[in-house]
A protein has these predicted regions:
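Juxtadomain coupling helices with adjacent low-complexity linkers
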Residues: 11-54, 143-210
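Sensory/regulatory domains in signal-transduction proteins
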Residues: 115-162
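Compositionally biased, low-complexity repeat tracts
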Residues: 7, 56, 84, 89, ...
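Structured interaction and signal-relay segments at domain junctions
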Residues: 48-125
Length: 210
């Protein structure tokens, strides 16, 4: 695990860490942490703003100046278990880490079922099972799943969706810049070579038919 941390202008601690980096062609580990930290600071600003806005908060005042976020790896195949498919976490506030299990449960359920955790909570509880989390929604933006926790269910959903959207947009911008730097190559890799997985898929083939 690698990570980074800082304090927001409003005084909220922001800590991020990633477990997987499927975008190594695009971002070093330190750069991925820096991106998560940048996006975490945006969420910290929103959390503080909505926590202190009182009746002016568009989705109601946030009850706590803290949150925990879990991002899943959008590139991970369905055969990879949830505990190995976590891309990283974003923790806001002194006790934001206490909400990571809730966020993980939402994100993990969403990945397993292929839909918002809240649907299972409210409509299909037979799909949850022992040890599942009883509250809240998860968000998915163009395949990027995020679970978030510590506010109301709707507030958690909004914040998860914002983080997912920001992450997808940031990766898209960096990917386009990478394409312009590299030109018309075939593979998303520093040496323009396929991943070992794709080589392994055809290792059994010995050559052209005679």
């Amino acid at each position: 695990m690698t990570g980074a941390e800082t304090v927001s202008p409003d005084g909220l601690n922001v800590h991020v860490a990633h477990r997987r980096n499927p975008y190594a062609y695009l971002l070093t580990d330190d750069e991925l942490d820096a991106l998560l930290l940048e996006l975490g600071l945006k969420r910290a600003a929103a959390i503080w703003r909505n926590h202190t806005a009182g009746e002016r908060a568009p989705r109601g005042a946030y009850p706590r100046p803290m949150m925990g976020f879990v991002l899943m790896d959008a590139t991970a195949g369905p055969w990879i278990p949830n505990d190995s498919a976590v891309l990283g976490v974003v923790v806001i506030g002194d006790r934001g880490h206490e909400y990571l299990p809730n966020a993980a449960a939402k994100a993990g359920c969403h990945r397993r079922l292929g839909r918002n955790n809240g649907e299972a909570v409210h409509v299909d509880p037979h799909r949850l099972g022992s040890g599942s989390f009883r509250y809240g929604h998860s968000a998915e933006v163009r395949g990027q799943i995020v679970g978030a926790s510590s506010q109301s269910p709707d507030q958690d959903l909004h914040e998860a969706g914002q983080l997912a959207a920001d992450f997808v947009a940031a990766l898209g911008e960096r990917h386009l810049a990478w394409e312009h730097r590299r030109g018309p190559e075939d593979w998303l890799s520093p040496d323009n070579a396929p991943a070992p997985e794709y080589r392994a898929m055809i290792d059994w083939y010995s050559g052209r038919p005679s």
